[in-house]
């Protein structure tokens, strides 16, 4: 499980355990480098930070946990990273699941980030972030805001990655996601080279696995079915 730009294992809450029960699969959720309880990052995010997660972290997880095949699931930017994992290891990726993933830089995305920047300027809101990231909180927040608002990032898209992903995919998105319109899941489904299903969740914003958890778990149960043994 690949978390979002401000996320960590703790912020998935009970979802990983519930996902394991719903699908009968082992679930691995981890803090990306610089987030949660991982070691603090020593530098800004690299320009290729999405591809780097598939290139560097995925093999480390495979070595550490002793697995090869996997289903890649990610939330928000973690969804883009999950797609990168599917692209990087097509021989090992059984399926792809994206939740509220961005496929390009949209005005709504930037507006949502600017609004969040204002909100986190308040000490009480920043303290909520620090509760989960500790001394890493400032780096976590700046990495998200500075990357997405950087004009050099404005032309980023997931298109090239999607075109190489052939495994089955489930693309979940909240109808009222403040960080991305329904154009994102539509573009993901259209761009994937393999079979894909889009599910737009009514009444949901950016965190469907919290806002519409029963529907999300049911969809994942139906999509993943019994694990291969």
Range-by-range predicted roles:
Residues 80-88, 92-125:
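Flexible "cap/lid" loop of the alpha/beta hydrolase fold
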Residues 176-180:
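Acidic catalytic loop of the alpha/beta-hydrolase fold
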Residues 23-70:
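Active-site loop/oxyanion-hole signature of alpha/beta-hydrolase fold enzymes
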Residues 167, 181-190:
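Short alpha-helix in the alpha/beta-hydrolase fold that links the catalytic acid
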Residues 204-217:
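Catalytic histidine-centered segment of alpha/beta-hydrolase-like enzymes
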């Amino acid at each position: 499980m690949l978390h979002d730009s401000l996320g960590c294992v703790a912020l998935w809450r009970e979802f990983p355990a519930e996902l394991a029960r719903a699908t009968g699969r082992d679930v691995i959720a981890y803090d990306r480098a610089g987030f949660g309880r991982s070691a603090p990052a020593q530098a800004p995010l690299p320009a290729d930070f999405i591809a780097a997660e598939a290139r560097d972290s995925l093999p480390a997880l495979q070595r550490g946990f002793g697995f090869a095949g996997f289903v890649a699931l990610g939330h928000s930017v973690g969804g883009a990273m999950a797609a990168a994992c599917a692209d990087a290891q097509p021989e090992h990726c059984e399926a792809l699941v994206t939740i509220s993933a961005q496929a390009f830089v949209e005005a709504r995305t930037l507006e949502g980030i600017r609004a969040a920047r204002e909100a986190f300027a308040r000490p009480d809101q920043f303290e909520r972030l620090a509760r989960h990231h500790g001394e890493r909180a400032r780096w976590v927040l700046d990495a998200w805001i500075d990357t997405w608002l950087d004009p050099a990032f404005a032309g980023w898209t997931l298109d090239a990655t999607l075109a190489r992903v052939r495994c089955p995919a489930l693309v979940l998105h909240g109808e009222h996601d403040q960080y991305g319109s329904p154009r994102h899941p539509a573009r993901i489904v259209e761009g994937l080279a393999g079979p894909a299903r889009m599910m737009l969740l009514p009444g949901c914003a950016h965190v469907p696995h919290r806002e519409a958890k029963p529907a999300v778990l049911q969809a994942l149960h139906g999509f993943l079915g019994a694990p291969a043994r």
